[in-house]
């Protein structure tokens, strides 16, 4: 969703044309007690200034786990060059400088920033924004493959996993791979799905794992060797 106080969420269309946009996943770890102030800065200033300088606000979330003090968001631009130019103009905007100075009068808000540039996979749903009255729980998942197995993982999602997710109440939101080698371009899949709520997510996964179609697809996909190098990482988001 596009920050909870805006009540916007990602809207999925499966009639998606090829998406060549540059996406950036940014993770801000707030200093202790500063997450609310960080959200306020985005709500009142940053999101609007991003749009002013050519960014598209794709989605903003905070972890469902209350002890996790991160803000996780995705923005996009037509391409990497324009993305970098937009950030430069954003940082030089007097309105941003004023908002930033005002926000840190009582201490800096952010302890750490992580950034990953992304491109959509050929099976990712189209990513748009719409307004909804029904909040959802989102799940951000990261898979790291064994050597030379990313194509196999993508094939399994394209041909089987995404469809089976839908059969078990999971909505496919977006699928990406990193564009930079040092961020895992050769072995990493990052995706977002959604559930009605976190309790339902447990049931959705239980149904998926026990699905015979999934068991067959997984068994066939690993006949010539394992696909994943390690267990997937996930975080529930709201």
Regions from the language model: what does each represent?
Residues 8-17:
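Hydrophobic h-region of N-terminal signal peptides that target proteins for export
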